């Protein structure tokens, strides 16, 4: 028997060639092995024969209720326990030799993972970023073709590592969405260097149904074995609800800028859109960093506002303080935020910021954080169609609260009517200073025309995205490109 046969515990037909593995029947190619696994709505075994018809060499599944009479389809009861060893052997990659840094949270996942990625590269390590922005190996260009999901599943992750010729003992900074945690996409990875919950507010209730289910999904990240488990202090109040957190030998490390006695306390001493200074006091570090207990570290960076410093603290704590000096100001001015994350557009005559904020808390936090730096905020944003309707009125309320004028526009209306989306958003809101313009490009142009000299145009919701979904069609659209056209 071959190594692959031994791992699965089955005999392949003579001459069987396996070139790649997938759990998606849509990705099956000639030479694939298809893994039929439990899905959100149905079991993948349902697509076993479809996979063979598309060229799969064979199919394996763990559905005890499926009775399929085909010599190329195998039932393996403990299939999920064998997946990682199989993929290691197939791609000649030992995934356990890589260092994983996982970040989840309602807001900030992309920024924290990307900042961690940049820090590792700066200190001479190879690093791979995986998340909403796509994938980036070291400082190469972003590749957005591997997955449409924020977090890949284990098959997609191996495909990414294989295609990037990623060496063992590398570093992988990965965003982990609540959907991925609920679906246990990465539960097969045996060990994470660090796992972090940046914050928990209400989001994705179209999927999770209620805030308790959403929070349960977020805390699943601590079921992944890791020696550094970080959490913001506001979210840590829920930790007693989870026995697996209480019984873990590696305790949660809390991070706060409000409580001086938090495990990790940070304070911003100076902040502006161009330069910020802060310090970190290590009161009670993670188990593996006891040598830095009671130490204090000073930093400078080009990030703002406060929540981006908060995200950076998680990145620093994830890789460890041994990379930094205790008695100097550690200069982190080389760090940049991802495209479309609190992105100040440079070299144009007006103040323009593009950000990805697309839920009530993110909009409120973002606008309230930057309004001290600009006298008038003109905000362009919309609400997604076919998504949680309950947050629409809250999103508009947050935008109205901190702005002098709001331009409500389209943001992936999908199959819904734009007018209905606006009606939901306007409910119980004073819309005296709200202008409704369906065409997003026209909305941005209008906002630029009414922008006061000392004001700031803030474009929210799409960030780095370059598509717009309307009436089941996806078209190219970029907030950045519109700004370039206006100010070129």
Regions found by a protein language model. Give the residues of each.
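Active-site regions of enzymes building and remodeling cell-envelope glycoconjugates
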Residues: 68-78, 144-146, 246-258, 263-267, ...
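Adenine nucleotide phosphate-binding catalytic loops in nucleotide-utilizing enzymes
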Residues: 4-6, 208-215, 219, 233, ...
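Short, polar loop motifs at secondary-structure junctions
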Residues: 59-67, 131-134, 233-237, 257-259, ...
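Flexible active-site lid/hinge loop adjacent to a nucleotide/diphosphate
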Residues: 141, 146-242, 360-363
